[in-house]
Amino acid sequence: MAFDKKLLEIVACPVCKGKLEYNKEAQQLICKADRLVYPINDGIPVLLENKAEPLIE
């Protein structure tokens, strides 16, 4: 199942409530403000702080 990019208009980082960016290749949502990466599983974003990983560029 593919991630619906329209969700980017309504979802926010659970930590800072900021905008998220979509990384299609890695199937992740990225919060650059907090430098956190949230996984997308089967097209569903997992926006739980304890599931986030540090952003490594």
Curated annotation (Swiss-Prot):
Listed InterPro entries: Trm112-like
From the record, give the transmembrane residue ranges.
Answer: none
Record GO cellular component, one term: cytosol
Family as reported in the entry's similarity comment = Belongs to the UPF0434 family.
Task: Spell out the protein name for this chain.
Answer: UPF0434 protein Shal_2504
Q: Which organism is it from?
A: Shewanella halifaxensis (strain HAW-EB4)
